[in-house]
Curated annotation (Swiss-Prot):
SUPFAM superfamilies: Cytochrome P450 (SSF48264). InterPro entries: Cyt_P450, Cyt_P450_CS, Cyt_P450_E_grp-I, Cyt_P450_sf, Cytochrome_P450_3A. Gene3D superfamilies: Cytochrome P450 (1.10.630.10). The keyword Secreted does not apply. Heme binds at residue 463. It comes from Caenorhabditis elegans. Cytochromes P450 are a group of heme-thiolate monooxygenases. They oxidize a variety of structurally unrelated compounds, including steroids, fatty acids, and xenobiotics. Belongs to the cytochrome P450 family. This is Putative cytochrome P450 CYP13A6. Its cofactor is heme. One of its GO terms (molecular function) is iron ion binding. Keywords: Heme, Iron, Metal-binding, Monooxygenase, Oxidoreductase. It is an enzyme of class 1 (oxidoreductase). Its EC number is 1.14.-.-.
Length: 518
């Protein structure tokens, strides 16, 4: 009897797995298939063979629209600008969710949901409360912290230059971005660069956890089990959970300090970092734990946004700004360094602009808008190396049809950003060339608005921290290029080897920094 029941259960599971796996076959949509129950999940969480480059290869094989399964999830890959623009902007009300791995949690109900993961009215509230942190006024306030972190980096570079050492700038930039975000997001008074115990923990988020993605990708209900057991699991199992614990300590310490100040009659004053900003919007947890439904999200623009954040949401926002601000900015700087080192004539032109527009040792906020060619260099860098493809996803919240392609409710959409940014029909036959001049005088500005160029995403869910990232990049590059030139060495990987499952990362960017006064 037990054998019969077990056989029936296994047959039912197998039949269900085959039914899910055959979804795109039944739809008549091409794509790689994999195996029932797994689909292409293993291929899309491979660190050494980045999934973003697999999307590129599959697009060449199957065309600009194709699909596959990842465990029980269906994912459609697209690389046509018109369809990207339709999904990210014009039909945003049908695609306001993101593709999420099960381990992330429920975007509607999870207490520690963040602005990247959540959707609907809850996303709108978090977006509204977070936006002031990235206004020009706020960026001016944190500019000094960014500059000071850059000065620390220059001191470290100087020590290595004196020893005539090659430098892996990827590691240097990770120290820099973690130093910046630790000060402006976590309220640390010092950056602790090159001795920050948080660095390996944050690195592990992007380099590890493949086993968790695989297990929970095949069996989503286990995600909830892992989350509840997070306190008992080793730090290496799910690194992000341990960082939550560290942030919780920092937030609680700020709350305790505010309570002491209130007793003494000390006013909190202007917010100095993200924790202050979010605490100013905090209310008792009970007021919003019930959540809000997302029906008629198209009409939600007229709904009043309540300034409410729970303790858990504050922790979640600090975490996502830490993780996103650490990796993507460091990678952008790394790719720019690689491209400048391998294109010395472009580097010289950029240095001439920096010398002309930033004559003082300090890089002020108003200098940044004058660095037009630097802006072109960074745009071209992110065209050639679209590192944040993971964020260029959406989830269909309501069945719809675009250009004859049907999107069912619950389907995930992933943009093949590499193909989009390397399409010769869009960018011309010199598409593989590093050519910042293509961006001069607004020549490619229209491509930033029609779905052809999306390094920071597009539409209402475009990266909220984009301007902070750009400020960090410009200030540090200007600081370095005033003093040094990047030079390739025998240890420089040419072409650069690409790795990563969450972001597209160079394995290393080893260069020599040559003092300009030499």
């Amino acid at each position: 009897m037990i054998f019969v029941l077990l056989s029936a259960v296994l047959l039912g599971v197998f039949t269900y797995s085959v039914w899910i796996w055959s979804y795109f076959i039944r739809k008549g949509i091409k794509g790689p298939r994999g195996f029932p129950g797994i689909g292409m999940l293993i291929q899309t969480i491979d660190h050494e063979n980045p999934p973003f480059l697999k999307y590129r290869d599959w697009t060449k094989q199957y065309g600009p629209v194709y699909g596959f399964t990842e465990g029980p999830q269906q994912t459609m890959i697209i690389s046509e600008p018109e369809m990207v623009n339709e999904i990210f902007k014009k039909q945003f009300d049908n695609f306001y969710g993101r593709k999420l791995r099960p381990i992330i949690g429920d975007p509607e109900k999870d207490k520690r949901v963040n602005i990247f993961s959540t959707q609907g009215k809850r996303w709108k509230r978090l977006r509204t409360l977070s936006s002031p942190s990235f206004s020009n006024n706020s960026l001016r306030k944190v500019r000094n912290s960014v500059q000071e972190c850059g000065t620390e980096i220059l001191w470290n570079i100087e020590q290595k230059v004196r020893k005539n050492e090659d430098i892996d700038m990827l590691i240097v930039y990770q120290e820099y971005t973690l130093g910046v975000i630790s000060r402006i997001a976590l309220g640390q008074s010092e950056s602790n660069m090159f001795k920050n115990p948080l660095l390996p923990k944050v690195q592990a988020i992007f380099n590890g956890s493949w086993h968790v993605f695989l297990i929970t990708g095949i069996f989503p209900p286990l995600a909830g089990v892992f989350r509840k057991m997070s306190k008992m699991l080793p730090a290496s199992f799910i690194p992000a959970f341990k960082i939550f614990d560290l942030i919780e300590v920092a937030v609680q310490a700020r709350i305790d300090q505010r309570a002491k100040d209130e007793i003494k009659g000390v006013e909190p004053g202007e917010p100095q970092d993200f924790i202050d900003l979010f605490l100013d919007a905090r209310v008792p947890d009970v007021k919003i734990l019930s959540g809000e439904a997302n029906e008629d999200f198209a009409k939600s623009s007229v709904v009043k946004i309540n300034k409410e954040l729970t303790f858990d949401e504050i922790i979640a926002q600090c975490f996502v700004f830490l993780a996103a601000g650490f990796d993507t900015t460091a990678l952008s700087l790394s790719y720019a360094t690689y491209l400048l080192a391998t294109h010395p004539e472009i580097q010289t032109k950029l240095q001439e602009e920096v010398d002309r527009e930033c004559p003082d040792p300090e890089i002020f906020f108003d200098h940044l808008s004058k660095l037009k060619y630097l802006e072109c260099v960074m745009k071209e860098t992110l065209r050639l190396y679209p590192l944040g493809t993971t964020a260029n996803t959406r989830k269909c919240m309501r069945e719809t049809t675009i250009n004859g392609v049907n999107f069912d409710e619950g389907m995930n959409i992933q943009v093949d950003t590499w193909t989009l940014h390397h399409n010769p029909r869009i960018w011309g036959e010199d598409v593989e060339d590093f050519k910042p001049e293509r961006w001069e005088n607004g020549a490619c500005e229209h491509l930033e608005h029609n779905g052809s160029y999306i390094p920071f995403g597009s539409g209402p869910r475009q990266c909220i921290g984009m301007r902070l990232a750009q400020m960090e990049q410009k200030i540090l590059l200007a600081q370095i290029l005033k003093e040094y030139s990047f030079r390739t060495t025998k240890n420089t990987q040419i072409p650069v080897k690409l790795v990563g499952k969450l972001t597209l990362s160079p394995e290393s960017v080893i260069v020599k920094l040559e003092p300009r006064d030499s």
